[in-house]
Amino acid sequence: MSEPLLHLTGISRSFTAGDREFLALKHIDLSIQAGEMVAITGASGSGKSTLMNILGCLDYATAGSYKVNGRETRDLDDQALAELRRDYFGFIFQRYHLLPHLSAMHNVEMPAIYAGTPQVRRHGRARELLARLGLSGHLGHRPSQLSGGQQQRVSIARALMNGGEVILADEPTGALDTASGKEVMNILQELHGLGHTVIIVTHDPKVAANAQRIIEVRDGEIVSDRANPRPADEAPSEPPVSVRPAGARRLVASLGLFKEAFVMAWVALVSHRMRTLLTMLGIVIGITSVVSIVAIGEGAKRYVLKDIQAIGSNTIDIFPGASFGDSRAAAIQTLMPADVTALNQLYYVDSATPMVGRSLLLRYGNIDLNATVNGVSHLYFQVRDIKLASGISFSENDARRQAQVVVIDHNTRNRLFGPDVDPLGQVILVGNLPCTVIGVTRENKNMFAASNLLNVWLPYETAAGRVLGQRHLDSISVRIKDGQPSKVVEEHVKKLMEQRHGTKDFFTNNLDSIMQTVQRTSRSLALLLSLIAVISLVVGGIGVMNIMLVSVTERTREIGIRMAVGARQSDIRQQFLVEAVMVCLIGGAIGISLSFAIGYLFTLFIKEWEMVFSMGSIITAFACSTLIGIVFGFVPARNAARLDPIEALARD
């Protein structure tokens, strides 16, 4: 006689209730050959269901040995037991145990998903099984749209999906009417005829009468094991055969499982829209806060830096004396036009301009104003990046011939001429020198500039020779070439000036240091605000964990069903972890979209500057979403994977 397919020796199963321990099974010895149709009967509480659970590797024995096709199960871990359930057993439950949010076809496919069967083959087999059971027109129907008999046929198809070498049917007709029950028993007999080993657990003698062999269990012991010969025409006409579909290779199977985890996660999330929305709300708020704050900070930084650049962030100013406030500075008259010429020869220097200035009286008609009169070179407007609103600036030729021309600023234009008079070509008195207005600068909206100051500019030669009567310079302004390091250029300027003067009787002022300070400050502020926003992300993550823990509790029976059809602990853990990550990623995407919407509204109401979104902040936001999903989804996923399949299936 061949080795039994299922062989139990001395199997006992005890349970603890408080301080008491009781035996549900007592020293069970049982062998079941491949291809048998066996009925296990007994009253409620007799131990028959516990025996079925041990046979199906859903439960474990406290003592004894249980072999499946010669393989000892006693020392197998949870993963190996899951593989045994997946490869050998198909379960048919009294209450069908179909997942309500999946269609009939997807319910049937579930065991093959965990077996790693390719999608095309999986779909084909599910259709074939459902068609064989008369459900070809109900592939897309959910359990709530099917009758009890139809649901049980879906359950049978699911049991056969991976071959179902052993069919374990727990009260398969218990929830059905007589006609549907008879139909299900006919299907089980057909499966037996095809070579499947069919084990029926029932308390109904009429159902048990369909089996070849009837085993009666009472008080945890087998009290009867008798043959029940059927008419010859009903006996199996073929030897047992394996109809298990070939699985995919390991790598392909793993990738397929990961893909299916995403599909199943999406179905689960869509099936509970309100819960999903509330779960991701905290993530949406957190991501929106982080991305928006970073964008506002970057926009503010660029706005400030732009204003600094407008007053000369890439310029170096040279002044007489040791530093600002030096009492000896007025007596030092060593800055000369020749220094400007020498500085213009340096490779690092884009342009340099002399500067002299005094507060003098301006007069036009009967209007007198005090303004700062600046004597500069024709390069001054390039050095300071000052744009003209109208007219032109003076030329090098104007400087050589000490032309009596002047460029005025926007404030001076308004004060002297008003809005209705074109100042170009008008003659004004600068001190006692009549000068023709040839240009007007744009209005200065720089946040670092005093908005009410009046400035006019003359060629340096004109100002020094005809207005101020001095040859030395008050200061020199040097514009650095683009791309050149400011500190390096500053050192070369200092070295050249010391060589020319023979001593260090000057000091330099470089606005680049101010720019760096602003950048550091803005980074610190953005970091501070981001940390505050991250707190909301953490709160959102805790919300995800709480809802996922609730979800695990609500879906305990689903977890038990998945384990019964072959899901390993790692599959369950991956399923819930993927759900948590998906919630956070969707929340992150919504949060980023909201940030862009806020940025658009921001530009409508605030014209001076705008929010600046960077790819780095968006990638960081998605990375944070993923990390939060993994970190805060791990505990619920771990709890789900650790559930006992028997307890999970028993949960309502």
From Swiss-Prot:
Keyword Transmembrane helix: yes
Localization per Swiss-Prot or TrEMBL: Cell inner membrane
InterPro entries in UniProt: AAA+_ATPase, ABC3_permease_C, ABC_transporter-like_ATP-bd, ABC_transporter-like_CS, MacB-like_ATP-bd, MacB_PCD, Macrolide_Exporter_MacB, P-loop_NTPase
This protein's name: Probable export ATP-binding/permease protein PFL_2149
UniProt-annotated binding residues for ATP: 42-49
Keywords in alphabetical order: ATP-binding, Cell inner membrane, Cell membrane, Membrane, Nucleotide-binding, Translocase, Transmembrane, Transmembrane helix, Transport
Transmembrane residue ranges: 251-271, 277-297, 525-545, 586-606, 615-635
UniProt keyword Disulfide bond, yes or no: no
Quaternary data: Probably part of a tripartite efflux system, which is composed of an inner membrane transporter, a periplasmic membrane fusion protein, and an outer membrane component.
Membrane topology: Multi-pass membrane protein
EC number(s) per entry: 7.6.2.-
Record function comment: Probably part of a tripartite efflux system.
Superkingdom, natural source: Bacteria
Residues making up the signal peptide according to the UniProt record: none
